[in-house]
């Protein structure tokens, strides 16, 4: 049975929709970093994605203030991109011969917020017997993994014009270059966030909860990660 004045331990289960913003500070393509040149495109430097994930919480209601520990695991994001372009470097109008450069870029990237273990303090505003808006703050220990494998290959080749009525001849590549950037990290950091929402008491012990939370996962070496989450769940007080 629950304690008087709405006090007592509780459990809560939520389904959350998260908007995730991931920013990677990879070396710029034109600037050397540790003797290497980055080949990573803007697509993998500034990622915006979303996911749906469950969240569970265990806490104690003090009759106004609530303190809870929560755990969530996010969906893994991964993608790949391939691009190719051909640029003419030289053309002889006298004989039709030309020199071209072919550039290929293959990228494979992933990001996974493996887990978030948080502790929150929330204050409920009792408007009436049913509705209770709330605000709060949250500190969390997060674990993320991310990787990038980007390879840029350039090939120069010569095209010789054939005799009238014949196809031109493409010579074997005579100049090849290849640059690559590989990086893989597993990082754990403490981050801070804010919480807001409203609870609706279905029964004295069962509450329907609609909430929002913003969380900054902290400086993850060369990565910044922020989430905006909207959730719907139920809270049961013992």
UniProtKB/Swiss-Prot annotation:
The keyword Signal applies. Coiled coil: none annotated. It holds the Pfam family Opacity. Residues 88-109, 162-183 are annotated as: Disordered. The keyword Signal applies. Gene3D superfamilies: 2.40.160.20. It comes from the Bacteria. It is found in: Cell outer membrane. Residues 168-183 have a biased composition (Polar residues). GO terms for molecular function: porin activity. Keywords: Cell outer membrane, Membrane, Signal, Transmembrane, Transmembrane beta strand. One of its GO terms (cellular component) is cell outer membrane. Residues 1 form the signal peptide. Belongs to the opacity porin family. Implicated in a number of adherence functions. OPA proteins are implicated in pathogenesis and are subject to phase variation. This is Opacity protein opA66.
């Amino acid at each position: 049975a629950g304690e008087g004045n709405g006090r007592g331990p509780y459990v809560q289960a939520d389904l959350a929709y998260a908007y995730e913003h991931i920013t990677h500070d990879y070396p710029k393509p034109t600037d050397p970093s540790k003797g290497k040149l980055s080949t990573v495109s803007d697509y993998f430097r500034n990622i915006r994605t979303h996911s749906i994930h469950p969240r569970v919480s265990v806490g104690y209601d003090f009759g106004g203030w609530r303190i809870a520990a929560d755990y969530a695991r996010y969906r893994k994001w991964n993608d790949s991109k391939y691009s190719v372009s051909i640029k003419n470097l030289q053309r002889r109008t006298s004989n039709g011969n030309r020199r071209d450069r072919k550039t290929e870029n293959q990228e494979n990237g992933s990001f996974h917020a493996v887990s978030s273990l948080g502790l929150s303090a929330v204050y409920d505003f009792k408007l009436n017997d049913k509705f209770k808006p709330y605000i709060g703050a949250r500190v969390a220990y997060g674990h993320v993994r991310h990787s990038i494998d980007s390879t840029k290959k350039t090939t120069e080749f010569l095209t010789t014009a054939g005799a009238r009525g014949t196809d031109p001849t493409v010579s074997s590549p005579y100049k090849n270059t290849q640059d690559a950037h590989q990086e893989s990290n597993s990082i754990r950091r403490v981050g801070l966030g804010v919480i807001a929402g409203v609870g609706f008491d279905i029964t004295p012990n069962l509450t329907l909860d609609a909430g929002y939370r913003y969380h900054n996962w902290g400086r993850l070496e060369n990565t910044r990660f922020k989430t905006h989450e909207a959730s719907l769940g139920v809270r049961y007080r013992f």
